[in-house]
Amino acid sequence: SANGYEAITISPSESPFYDDGDLKITAFLVEHEPVSPSLGFRFDYKGRSIVFSGDTIYSENLLKYAKDADVLFMEALSMDIISRLQKAQESIGNEGNAKIMFDIQDYHISPKDGARLAKKANVKHLVFYHLAPAPVISLMAEVFTRGVDEIFSDFTLADDGTHVVLPKNSKEIKISSIN
């Protein structure tokens, strides 16, 4: 226990691990080998729902738990940018970093695959977060999301300060920045 909080062990299950009658929180498995188990989370509250993918690739289990969610928070890795970084690291002889850039492409989802999953799951809004590499300028953001809007147009590329509000008893999704 720290600062009055008690750690609990969470096991993925069809049933919520927390349910107070209003808020239900469900943990589910995602694919992030070599790290296993890895979890995603679904929060259901008074008719609204948010899903956090955690680090993962496209999977049927994530698709199942994202079904009809108001908002899907999806981590994303730009395969294009990362593969360029990998080649740059190789060209300067930094084999360690080049290997990392190569390996991470196997256990993170691309923005386009995230968009495909959101569309198939009938998600209302997709928020890309935990971005690799984080696009720090608008041109990089355009490269990061290239082709996404052709698959799923209702998305946000989050940064520090992105604020998402789902008013209860509503279908509205409010996206703003607190910066």
Where are these regions (language model features)?
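Core dinuclear metal-dependent hydrolase active-site scaffold
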Residues: 2-67, 163-179
